[in-house]
Amino acid sequence: MKSNKLMALGIVFSIAVLIVIGTIAYSIINDKKDKGNEMFAYSTQQSLGKDDAPVKVVEFGDFKCPACRTWDVTVLPRLKEEYIDKGKVQLYFINFPFIGKDSDLGAAAGEAIYKQDKDSFWIFYDEIYQNQKKDTEEWITEDLLLSIVKEKLPKVDVEQFKKDLHSKDIKEKVSKDSDRAQKLKVQGAPSVYVNGNLANPDFDSMKKAIDKELKK
């Protein structure tokens, strides 16, 4: 009888310990989410991948930035294949328009497109980099943007895009992204964060940072 009571107490104690551990783990996970939301406002940003992916990667970029184009061509495809498509990583893009006046126009275009169709933004993301010229030139024009929308983005309504491109809401969103970059003291583009931690943007460095987070 005594041994049965001890066994029952042991089971109760074990369950209590598991509950405490689970509560702590849940708290840690939510603390990370809260930290990320505070730093990056995940829910307001362009995203690629599953919402429940355990690792959040944030890219601050400018469509006029040559290094950002290189990142799009060399790093993103591998990141997508090895992590995003497998549900391990969700990628967020945050505007950091710092090179020229037309950087803001490119950022606004991305926001206006994403507002209509999320997948179309990532097509635009590739297309505008393919059209990239010297960063000293003001090459992001409304004509270029409209040609991309008309020729490459069938899910985006052209007239609505024109209205949104210069709308107050879109301008405020781009401005908030710029403010966020300043608060984080972003020094250049692409600047990449892995679960809130600044990482080198080359694939090997990102892979190490991501794998480290996946092991936690």
From Swiss-Prot:
Disulfide bonds: 65-68
Keyword tags: Disulfide bond, Oxidoreductase, Redox-active center, Signal
Entry-linked InterPro entries: Thioredoxin-like_fold, Thioredoxin-like_sf
Annotated SUPFAM superfamilies: Thioredoxin-like
Signal peptide residues on this chain, from the entry's feature table: 1-25
MF annotations from Gene Ontology: oxidoreductase activity
UniProt family annotation: Belongs to the thioredoxin family. DsbA subfamily.
Described purpose of this protein according to its UniProt entry: May be required for disulfide bond formation in some proteins.
PANTHER family: DISULFIDE BOND FORMATION PROTEIN D (PTHR13887:SF14), GLUTATHIONE S-TRANSFERASE KAPPA (PTHR13887)
Full protein name: Probable disulfide bond formation protein D
Lineage, highest ranks first: Bacteria, Bacillati, Bacillota, Bacilli, Bacillales
